[in-house]
Structure formats: structure tokens, C-alpha cells
Amino acid sequence: MSQSPKILAFAGSTRQGSFNKKLVKIAAGGARDGGAEVTEIDLRDFPMPLYDGDLEANEGLPEHAKRLKVLFKQHQGLLISAPEYNGGMSAVLKNAIDWVSRREGDEAALAAYKDKVAGLVAASPGRLGGLRGLVHTRQILTNLGVLVIPQQHALSGAGDAFDDDGALKDSTAEAAVTGIGARVARTIAALQAAGR
């Protein structure tokens, strides 16, 4: 019998009160309902310098990058709420992805991304809901070998979208976001059953 899918959930924002932190919690709830074990983290707890090849050559991976990489390797799935900054992903998210991608010792290239399944959501006060950032995030993860499910949700008008308990006021949007979490869990389970 296969184990429950393990999914790592986080937002590409370190801002307190981030709409994307609220949104990824909803997606994580959907993954739990779909049978997954979900670990929620905050990138604020993993401060890292900007990726620098000279720094890596001289000092290796920063300690927080190593910790984050271990978490990636311990989970089969990712749920990411990716804010859009100037039409692309946030610097903190790109930096985390870059550090985690780095090889240590004799490990395989991109070991932390091997056989990963990911689901993407975004929240923004603007009309597009962070959609352009999702395109960029999907492209980067796909280039790293991650299977990003086709369903995604870009939440516009995020400033007024959440109730006092952190749920979405719009039940259709809530269902879409929880559905993405559940679909990541189901996809991992199906791949496990197929022997991948």
C-alpha cells in the first residue's frame, strides 16, 4: 500500500499579512482533504543571500538553503502561491528555487526537483490576480523537470477576497483553490500507484 502523498506548501512572499500566504493555506487544506500530508512553511524562516556562484564555490550552500533543500527532497509535491512582481515571479521565490537547484557532492543534478508534482495559485489586488507571475513560475519549474498540473488559479481583488477567518468569500474561488491542492495529492497518488 502506498504512503500518503507528502506536499510542501509555501508562498513566494515573506510579507506579513501576505495574500499569497493566506491563499496557499486554502490550497493546503484541499490537499489534506485529498489525503495528503502537508507541511506548510514560510520563506521568511529561510533567509538566504542572493544566489552567487562565487559564494557557492567558496562556502557551499548557505545553511538555510540546505534546510530548504532537505524539505524539498522529503516531499513529492509542491503547492506554491506565487505573487507577481512586475510581470514575473518574486525575487525571494526565484532565489529559493535557484539555491535548492544546486548540486551538492555526488548527488544527481536537480535532485530536489526529481519526480515532483506542483500546483500553482496566486493572489493580487490587481485585475489579473498575478496571472503573469504564474506563467513565469510554471516555465521555471517545468524547466527543472517538475510536473506542474494544468489547473491554476489567479485571485484578483485579493484585498477584499478573504473573510476574517482567512477563507475566500467567493465559494467558487474557494473550490477552485482547494481543488488544486486536492488534484496535486491525487496526481501524486496516481503516480505512486503506477510505480513511479
Residue ranges and their predicted role:
Residues 2-6, 21, 147-196:
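Glycine-rich phosphate/pyrophosphate-binding loop and the adjoining helix
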Residues 12, 43, 123-124:
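Cofactor-binding loop segments of dinucleotide-utilizing enzymes, especially the Rossmann-like FAD-
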Residues 43-60, 161-165:
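N-terminal beta-loop-helix "entrance" segment that forms/cooperates
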Residues 2-35:
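N-terminal beta1-alpha1 ligand-phosphate binding loop
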Residues 33-39, 146:
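A generic structural motif
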Residues 60-144:
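Helix-loop-strand module that forms the ligand-binding subsite of alpha/beta enzymes
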